[in-house]
Every structure is written in structure tokens, then in C-alpha cells.
Amino acid sequence: EARTDENIKAIVLRIDSPGGNALTSELIWREIELTKKIKPIVVSMGNYAASGGYYIACNANKIFAEENTITGSIGVFGILPNFTQLTTKMGINVEQVNTNKNAADYSVFRPLDENFRAFTLEGVEKIYNTFVNHVASGRKMTYAQVDAIGQGRVWSGSDAVKIGLVDKIGGLDDALKYAADLAKIKDYKTQNFPEYNKNFKDLLGSKERKLKTNF
């Protein structure tokens, strides 16, 4: 919506996230890449912009961070829960029927075999390579340069400026002013996206609502 609205001349993306799902990060990165071809995008980092939070920041036209922002964490990990020992300890016997051996690879009721472990590791490494390549492209660095400061390392905002992951130290107001300069406008007003049609009580949730979490 912000990309196609001709009245919007520049976008400031406020990021306050320690990371998240790899696919979601890639989808947001792609939207930023498409939008950047039409209008400038400036990132303003809050307390966190790490892992997936940095993934979606790396291709912006300019990146601002606070001195103590936690950023970087260019790395990938996967979690495969296994309940084998738990069910054995509780005396629960689980029988599975599947079409072939590979169909049960993601089962939480069987140990992780070496073949599937190697397959999973290969997938994680591919995602990491994509992550590093995105950062290298967005920050005008080589793969080796990004990998040297990547591998899951976290950096403060001030350190991130020194190593090239962030452009400037500054807050949201600084990012807004810079975006206005890029768009070559002096008088402007801001609009928040997405716009939520909920009140404060709805955001807090009712007593009956259950907590939902994701990675």
C-alpha cells in the first residue's frame, strides 16, 4: 500500500525485533527490494534489529541505529523438538505408520538420524548463504567481509557503524529528516502503516485469550 500510494514519497521502516522466521524475513526483504525501486526506504532501528530484524534492514537506502541498539546476529538456526526420552520415561509407546522412511523424518517421536541431520544442516547453511549475500549486496560488501562479522555475532549500534552494518547513529526523527531529504521535500507529514482498527483494550486482549508464540 505504501509502495503504490503516489502521495507517499519516502518510507521510514522502524524495526524493533530480535529476529524471527526465515521465510517471513525473506518476504519482507523482497517487498523492500521492490519498493526501493520506486521510492527511498530508510531504516530506523530501535532496541533490537538482530537476525531477521537485520535481514529486513540490510537493503535499505540508509540505516540509522541508536548507540546501544543490538543488531547484527547474521546467522541461522533450526529447532527440531524430540520427545523420545520423555515418552519413554513416562511409559508411553508411540507407533507410527508412514508411506516411506522419509515421511517420518520430522516426527517428534523418533530420534534424529544422521542423514536427516545432514539434510537439515544443508538447508540451514543455504539460508545463511542467502542472508550473507543479501547483506553483501545491500551494504556494498563482499561475501567474505560479511561472513567475517556474521556467524551469529551481535553488535551494538555504535560498533555496527564501524564495521559497515549501519550508516549513522540517530533516532527516528533523524531517519525521518533523512528520508525527507532523499525525497527532496521540506514540508511533510507522517502516516503510520499498518493502521490498526483496534483500541488499546483490543491490543491487550481479553482474559480468555490465550498467549500465542512463534519463532
Describe the residue ranges of each PLM region.
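Beta-strand segments within the central parallel beta-sheet cores of soluble alpha/beta enzyme folds
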Residues: 13-14, 46, 146-149, 190-191
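Short glycine/threonine-rich loop-to-helix capping motif typified by GTGT followed
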Residues: 22-27, 159-162, 202-206
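Cleft-lining beta-strand/loop regions that shape enzyme active-site pockets
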Residues: 1-86
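Charged, glycine-interspersed solvent-exposed loop segments at helix/strand-loop junctions
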Residues: 12, 84, 88-163, 167-169, ...
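Intrinsic disorder and flexible/low-complexity segments
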Residues: 1, 123, 194-215
